[in-house]
């Protein structure tokens, strides 16, 4: 049977999430996580469905993609299909041809597992490598230390506070209480937690959302941020440690995060919270002239 490119629709998102869960492995390269779809769900079910693409053969999903922002496709590929020549050729055709409905003409980026054959084909087509990102992972086999600050699990009643911390942590963020409820209504959030860290004065100083992919699989921190008025006091480390503890309670084998290598402060914060740096990864990109 031929390789099929699909748009799952709102009713098919659960199947895409299930595939992403199955493919998460501590021994494998970092790739799109169900938590990435969960975080995107803040825009609503319809918007998330419109941003997802799947590639399947003989009824089996082999790759899942998320159009995560203008001109960016983030991919996860089944472990036994990352060097599959037929899949790689079809992926390359679909991401390089605007008529296929994946990426528009012009500047574009593809984030794919580092060992995927797709990288070779895109390189042959003239796609270069972009700025490096640093993945970090913390093993959760052993109990996690106390974070040293008060941590609260945010539910519907704390959605306003969680949203306010998000906006105060990220310049340009428009995250609202409504976005939180939209995110929490998605299937991935059944295995997720939002945490809020509080300072000595009782102010909400940092926030993080953690996403489990199921017992024995790596969990994801996305996003983590510290209120701009409370930086430099160790709250980033504290809420990251709390995030690792929450994922361990959810049964995750490890806690994972990825940040631009140029963001040395974030890399240092995660390292201080017991996360180990992994080899840098790079997106493939096409500039506008090649579009």
Residue ranges and their predicted role:
Residues 1-21, 150-163:
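A short beta-loop-alpha structural element at the N-terminal edge
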Residues 19-34, 164-177:
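Helix-loop element at the rim of GNAT/NAT acetyltransferase active sites that forms part
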Residues 24-99, 208-219, 227:
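Conserved donor-binding loop and adjoining core beta-sheet/short helix segment
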Residues 67-70, 175-226:
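A conserved beta-strand-loop-helix scaffold within acyl/acetyltransferase catalytic domains
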Residues 69-148, 282-286:
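Acyl-donor-binding surface of acyltransferase catalytic domains
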Residues 83-98, 223-228, 232-249, 267-272:
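Conserved acetyl-CoA-binding loop-helix of GNAT-fold acetyltransferases
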Residues 108-110, 221, 255-259:
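Conserved hydrophobic beta-strand within the GNAT/NAT acetyltransferase core sheet
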Residues 118-122, 270, 275:
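Conserved active-site tyrosine of GNAT-family acetyltransferases
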């Amino acid at each position: 049977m031929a390789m099929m490119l699909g748009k799952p629709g709102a009713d098919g998102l659960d199947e895409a999430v299930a595939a992403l869960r199955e493919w998460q492995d501590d021994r494998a390269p970092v790739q799109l996580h169900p938590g990435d779809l969960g975080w995107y769900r803040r825009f609503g079910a319809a918007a998330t469905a419109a941003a997802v693409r799947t590639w399947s053969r003989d009824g089996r999903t082999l790759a899942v993609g998320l159009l995560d922002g203008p001109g960016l496709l983030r991919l996860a590929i089944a472990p036994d299909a990352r060097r599959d020549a037929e899949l790689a050729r079809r992926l390359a055709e679909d991401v390089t041809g605007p008529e296929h409905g994946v990426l528009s003409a012009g500047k574009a980026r593809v984030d794919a597992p580092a060992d995927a054959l797709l990288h070779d084909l895109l390189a042959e087509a003239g796609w270069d490598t972009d700025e490096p990102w640093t993945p970090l992972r913390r093993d959760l086999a052993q109990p996690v230390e106390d974070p040293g600050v008060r941590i609260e699990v945010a539910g519907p009643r704390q959605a306003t506070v969680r949203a306010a911390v998000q906006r105060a942590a990220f310049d340009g963020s428009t995250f609202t209480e409504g976005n939180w409820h939209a995110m929490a209504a998605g299937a991935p959030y059944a295995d997720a937690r939002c945490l809020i860290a509080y300072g000595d004065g009782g102010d909400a100083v940092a926030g993080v959302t953690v996403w489990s992919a199921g017992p024995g699989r790596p969990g994801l921190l996305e996003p983590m941020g510290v209120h701009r008025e409370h930086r430099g006091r160790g709250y980033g480390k504290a809420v990251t440690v709390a995030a690792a503890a929450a994922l361990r309670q959810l049964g995750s084998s490890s806690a994972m995060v990825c940040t631009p290598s140029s963001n040395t402060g974030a890399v240092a914060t995660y390292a201080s919270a017991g996360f180990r740096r992994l080899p840098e990864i790079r997106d493939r990109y096409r500039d506008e002239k090649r579009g």
